[in-house]
Amino acid sequence: MAQAKEVRGPGPRMGGPHPKVENPGKLLKRIMDEVFRHYLPHCILVLVCIVVSALANVQASLFLKTLMDDYIVPMTQQQDPDFAPLAAALLRVGIIYVIGILAAWGNARIMVNVTQGTLRNLRTQLFTHMESLPIKYFDQHPHGDIMSVYTNDVDTLRQMLSQSIPQLVSSAITIVSVFFSMCMLSWQLTIVTMLMVALMMFCSKKITQQSGKYFIQQQRDLGKLNGYIEEMMEGQKVVKVFTHEQKALDGFRQLNDQLKDSANKANSFANIMMPVNAQLGNISYAVCALAGAAMAVSGMGGTTLGTVVAFLSLNKSFNMPISQVSMQANSVIMALAGAERIFKMMDEPSETDEGYVTLVNARYDHDDNLVETPERTGLWAWKHPHHDGTTTYHKLAGDITFTDVDFGYVPEKTVLHGINLYGRPGQKIAFVGSTGAGKTTITNLINRFYDIQDGKIRYDGINIHKIKKADLRRSLGIVLQDTHLFTGTVMENIRYGRLDATDEECIAAARLANADSFIKRLPEGYNTMLTGDGANLSQGQRQLLAIARAAVADPPVLILDEATSSIDTRTEALVQRGMDGLMYGRTSFVIAHRLSTVRNADCIVVLEQGRIIERGSHDELIAKKGKYYQLYTGNLAEN
């Protein structure tokens, strides 16, 4: 397995080499647009709650001046004080407190719904867009890094939406209202407070600048670690076969240590912000208390004891949101780092499809003309609309032709050169050649997982670029090199080939693939649950199910990519008999690894470095004693 330094990290679009969050204002606007699109009335109600809560807190602080100057101080000078006015005043301020508490509770309650709904919508959009991405995207990005976008990056938005942004809005409203209240009480003490606030903001800015870059690095390292864990989980058998457990652990420790270091740096700076701001706030409080006491004693500016008490309460209310703004800034920066990765994935171009020819159910009318029908007839036709408004129908036969096809996964490196081949209806074409010769690449071009750079591929005489990709792929039965089964019953996995297939059709497909006998021996037969990509089945059984899944689709063209390369000889015989029945009457392209697959092929295509160097039947190629003869008497004969 690869060492840690060889593990693929996220590239530029997954938060790779970006030194900082680009366009944070644009990202924040995009997030809020997503929120407002679905929850604008809720956000307005939240804003009302925040305003009410902030004003209630300010009013409660201002009440202290009235309490001290109009009630407490006069009552200390009375021999028989009347507590009724004081009780009434306390009742009024108590009501204000209750209103503030209810408003804060309403704000929190509504924001939970808004946040979870927004995250649900984002995850849905992410998954919907992911389904539209081309195969090459998944070939170029580690799956663990993609998973990190769904989990970690989306979760960073949760705290920002539910806490940080409401807290920032609340802090802004509180700061403005408290500032004007302090100015009304004492402009001199307000100046003292603002000087301390300026120092607090300067320190917060410096801390935020340092922590921000490390939060981005933390998200990047987390994506790398997730990708490595997924790679090790998928390759666990290989790790154990080669006894590389320690090597895998060393790679994990290296990436885990990188994550720990970046997280330490990010959180070390972030965590000192609160104590620094708290101490500066305490200093501000003490300075204002001393200055206010001196002003009250000297009577400067009409300062009273009530003025000082109320101002100190406002000072606390002013410093707290300033400190909260600084703290929440880190959360916002971390969330924006995640949002950048989310939106870059969502902005990845979808798979293009310029096709207009579709696949439809067809039948012959009384005049023996092919016409479209809504019922499933077992007869398929290509529906070809023309510029003059007319529509023609061509029977789907399974005739596939390559003409002078060139292709490269990257433009500067061509891997297929001048490919010319054809598969007539019912023919079996086998591809042989050494690893990297281009066998799998050809099959990827037939189903348009990738598009050619030059030449033409025709399907029943139609350029496949004119055929809608969904319809093209619906006409193909594919058994991939890596068999993948989904969580669900055996029946559901077979039905995945055609979702409207009946149980009887699924069972018939399993019989055709020679899978019926082993399925019946499972604990619950066709209702046996499969989990973990069919981990409770053998490799051969998994491939038999994959073949049954292709069979239930009843396609005119089959693509078998190394379908029998990793099963034992006895199981291969079962699969081969099933495949012979499945391939009868269908055009079949087979990447061959077994002698039995090659010998009965109508045409054998020998590939070398992306070029066809030989073609013909088994006997013809053996007689030539060329590359195929070497493979036959060497590698293929050994298999």
Describe every region a protein language model picked out.
Residues P74, S181-L195, K265, F269-E340, ...:
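Helix-loop-helix
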Residues Q79, A362-N639:
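ABC-type nucleotide-binding domain
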